[in-house]
Amino acid sequence: MNLGIPRGVQDILPDETPFWHLIENTARNLFEKYNYEEIRTPIFEFTELFIKGTGETTDIVMKEMYTFQDKKGRSLTLRPEGTPGVIRAYLMNKVYATTPIWKVYYIGPMFRYERPQAGRYRQFHQLGVEVLGRKDPYIDFEIINLAIEFLKTLELENLEVEINSLGCTKCRPAYREALKNYFSQYKDILSHIDQERLERNPLRILDSKDEKIIPLKENAPQPLDFLCDDCKNHFEKVLNYMKEADLSFKISPKLVRGLDYYTRTVFEITTTSLGAQNAVVGGGRYDNLVETYGGPSTPGLGFALGIERLILLLKQQNKIKIERPSLIFIAIEKEKYVKKAMEIAKTLRTNYRVEMGSPEESLRTQLKWADKLNSDYVIFVNQGIENNILKIKNFKTGEEKEIKIKDIKELQHIVL
């Protein structure tokens, strides 16, 4: 039997999970202060959901999805991103009928067949927020500010917002046509995939990793030059809110993001703390996505980040400090003292982690357990307990003392 695991997945062992708890708890506490509520959607959906929403010309749909057929021949896909499932839940449950503004966040595993590298896996975990029902520019600012506040709460340094506007259904067609005309000049050097994108969605060529295409992108038309008055006004207001909040940003005219549904505001948050520029968060508006799925006209926007990548960055910056309650080991001399040991353990667990020994093992064996568990203290439950006396040993310094207790609750705070 092969006890290995497929490439691109990992076990998250107990010594790593405190990092995950820190990020997840920080997100929940902060997002809920901004009136976001948690949503949990299935990890697999009908494949059509992602083809229609994420976009059939995106790298995700064309190259990276884990798609399979169930026993009845229906095409299912492990979710490669979180937004389509949230929109599907919004429509299927008719949330729009009772909730004009819906603010949700999600935390969970996603799946993409891409080349594994540091901080990137084929099963990875995303944390994201979505807002449905608001088209005003302030909410664009709010989610960018929320992402920044979240990263700063985790003490991630040297953050910069890169922002752009892709326009709307009124002004986007002219930009698409300009892109198509520009790249058509170089059709002979485009890959087969990029030639297909040229005809179906030329914006996706801007995502191309083909080395022959990268220099061509430098002189490609920019969406900001094609914005209609409404989109210009919207974008200017977003930028003004960011200035008023003293959020530094850089307008990046070539930023388009890798998903087909984005409209107007798109952004990435990067950090340069590690030398090379690293994207940490990405997001934007998707004002037509709900309609794409057959729902009512509903503006929307959101952002997402990869938890594995964030943990890697925080570790490299030495920003993750995990503090766990002291571990107290209770060594039990005889079977008749087990009940009293249980009472002591119950009281101590108010403030500490507690591991119980066993009277069926010698004291020497129990102390070996305590050592291997890296215990901070050992409490000896022996004959002394009959006189309300406990011996406590600081397992780090070796210091010992006896304490007389009248009430087990006196043990809730041990100082030695």
UniProtKB/Swiss-Prot annotation:
Pfam families according to UniProt = HGTP_anticodon, tRNA-synt_His
Tell me which Gene Ontology terms the entry assigns under biological process: histidyl-tRNA aminoacylation
The protein's annotated catalytic reaction(s) are:
tRNA(His) + L-histidine + ATP = L-histidyl-tRNA(His) + AMP + diphosphate + H(+)
Task: Check the record and name the Gene3D superfamilies matching this protein.
Answer: Anticodon-binding domain (3.40.50.800), Bira Bifunctional Protein, Domain 2 (3.30.930.10)
Q: List the disulfide bonds.
A: none
Keywords recorded for this protein, A-Z = Aminoacyl-tRNA synthetase, ATP-binding, Cytoplasm, Ligase, Nucleotide-binding, Protein biosynthesis
Q: Name one GO molecular function term.
A: histidine-tRNA ligase activity
Q: Look up keyword Cell cycle and say if it applies.
A: no
Question: Can you quote a single GO CC term?
Answer: cytoplasm
- Give the multimer and partner information: Homodimer.
Cross-referenced HAMAP family, in alphabetical order? His_tRNA_synth
Member of which family?
A: Belongs to the class-II aminoacyl-tRNA synthetase family.
Q: What's the name of the protein?
A: Histidine--tRNA ligase
